[in-house]
Design a protein with these regions (language model features):
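Juxtamembrane intracellular "pre-TM" segments in multi-pass secondary transporters
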Residues: 1-27
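Extracytoplasmic gate region of multi-pass secondary transporters
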Residues: 17-79, 132, 136, 167
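Helix-to-loop junctions at the C-terminal end of transmembrane segments
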Residues: 74-87, 175
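C-terminal transmembrane helical hairpin of 12-TM major facilitator-type secondary transporters
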Residues: 88-138
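Small/hydrophobic positions within alpha-helical transmembrane segments
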Residues: 33, 66, 70, 123, ...
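A late C-terminal transmembrane helix in Major Facilitator Superfamily
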Residues: 143-178
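A membrane-interface helix-boundary motif in multi-pass transporters
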Residues: 171-191
C-alpha cells in the first residue's frame, strides 16, 4: 500500500512538473513575441514613417517619442482591465488580439496616411506594453509556491530581452529583403501567434493557479 501511494504521488508530481514546463514554455515564447513587437515597433516605426512618406526626420523622431507616451496610457488601461477581467492569460490574449487588429490595420492602410499609421502603430506598441506588464509582473507570483519569485520574474524579463534582440537584427534584415509592407504583415502574424498561444493555455493556467 505504501509503495502504491508513493507511485501515485510520484506520478502526480511528474504530471505537475510536465504541466509547469508547458505553461512556462508557452508563457516564455509569448513574452519573446511581445518583445519582438514592442521594441520592433518603437525602434523601426520612425524609419518606416520617414522612408514610406518621405517626411522630415524631425517628424519621424516625434513618432518615436509619441509611441512610449501612448504606451504609458495603455499600461494604465491594462491595470484597470485586470481588475475587471478574471485570468491573466485571458487579458493577455485580448491585448495580443488588439495588437493583431492594429498590426493588420497598419498593413492594410500601408502608404496611405502617416497619421493613421502612427495611430495604429501606437496602439500596437501600447498593446505589447500591456502584455509585458501582465506577463512579467502579474504572473511570477503564482510560481512562488514552487520556488523563488524573483528568479521567475528575472527569467521572464530575460525573454523580453531575447525578443528585443531578435527585433533589432531580425526585423532590419527582414525589411531590407522583403520590404516594409511584408514587415507589417509579419507583425500581424507575430501578434496572432501570441494571441493564440495565450488563449490556448488559459484553461490549464487557471487550473494551475488553484492547485
Amino acid at each position: 500500500s505504501g509503495s502504491h501511494d508513493e507511485m501515485v504521488k510520484s506520478n502526480g508530481s511528474f504530471k505537475l512538473t510536465v504541466k509547469i514546463f508547458w505553461i512556462l514554455a508557452a508563457i516564455m515564447l509569448a513574452i519573446v513575441l511581445q518583445g519582438i513587437l514592442r521594441d520592433g515597433v518603437s525602434t523601426w516605426m520612425p524609419s518606416y514613417i520617414a522612408e514610406t512618406f518621405k517626411l522630415d526626420n524631425k517628424i519621424s523622431i516625434f513618432t518615436g517619442v509619441f509611441l512610449p507616451l501612448f504606451s504609458i496610457a495603455v499600461v494604465q488601461l491594462t491595470i484597470f482591465l485586470y481588475k475587471k477581467i478574471p485570468g491573466e492569460l485571458t487579458l493577455t490574449g485580448f491585448m495580443f488580439g488588439a495588437g493583431v487588429i492594429s498590426a493588420f490595420a497598419l498593413y492594410a492602410t500601408d502608404n496611405t496616411s502617416a497619421v493613421i499609421s502612427v495611430l495604429f502603430a501606437a496602439t500596437l506598441s501600447g498593446s505589447m506594453h500591456g502584455v509585458n506588464t501582465m506577463m512579467t509582473c502579474m504572473i511570477p507570483p503564482y510560481f512562488g509556491k514552487y520556488g523563488n519569485i524573483s528568479f521567475m520574474a528575472g527569467l521572464l524579463n530575460f525573454c523580453t530581452y531575447i525578443g528585443s534582440a531578435a527585433s533589432g537584427f531580425g526585423l532590419a534584415l527582414f525589411s531590407e529583403n522583403f520590404g516594409w509592407h511584408n514587415t507589417l504583415l509579419l507583425w500581424s502574424m507575430i501578434a496572432l501567434c501570441g494571441c493564440l498561444l495565450c488563449l490556448s493555455i488559459t484553461r490549464i493556467w487557471n487550473k494551475f493557479k488553484i492547485e
